[in-house]
Amino acid sequence: MAQPLLARLREKLPGVEIDLLAPEWVASVARRMPEVKEVIAAPFRHGALQLRERWKLGRALRLRGYDQAIVLPNTWKSALVPFFADIPLRSGYIGESRYGLLNLLYKKQAAAMALHYARLSEPPGKAPQQPLPAPRLRVAPGEVTAAARRFGLEGPYAVLCPGAEYGPAKRWPYFKELAQCLGIEVVLLGSGNDRESGGGIPGNNLIGKTTLDEALRLIAGAAFVVSNDSGLMHIAAALGRPQVALFGSSNPEHTPPASPAARVVWLHLDCSPCYARVCPLGHFRCMNEMSVEMVLQEIQSLNA
């Protein structure tokens, strides 16, 4: 969702070099962004302050002489490394009262996440030109072939992503029934935390058995992808794969799959989006009432 910001920076500043400080678990995806020169893997545990480690990294980056840091997360701790690196221009949203840590501050406005980030390419208060550049990831055809061979895939296959680490309110419960209707080899993808979601679904279950980069390459070779609102959904969109994205407690207007090859299924219930991890009303209608037939209809429309 942040890649349109990077593309817009390259448009506005020809010749600019962009390095990306990213968590290790997403670094492999960031390295496939054509706008990025170098990815620096952040050595921090999720949610941990690790003040000394942030200071050490900041002092090391000081030697690179960066002109500007754009801080995307809203947390206080995420602004520490650019501050310790003495980067002269440090911009981002106010977030957790980051006065001083950042010196070019933006006020949050309601918007889709891609637009939210793209605003950081303009002075505060100025809207970026639209439409925004579409996200895209680089994958060579040989990498796709090698990944399929590595996991024993010989013919066309569909990728299903039944997990969503955010919580049960984002997980559609009928992937098993869908897989039984497809008439094509099925590959299940997700992280180790998604293993329970893949239980009982017929197909080549690779959930928790691939790296993120391997999953990316398998998605790049898929005939189509069906997923919940998840990180793999956004990867499929950036790869331009035909896909159907299923939304329950979240809002496809806020975090859509940014691709013309994407279809969205969302029931528009009065209680949705609630953004809850577990249905606060106990009925889970936003996903329970999303039928297999609805999803199959959208899959069929991908080839129309």
Residue locations for each model-derived region?
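Catalytic machinery of carbohydrate-active enzymes
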Residues: 1-304
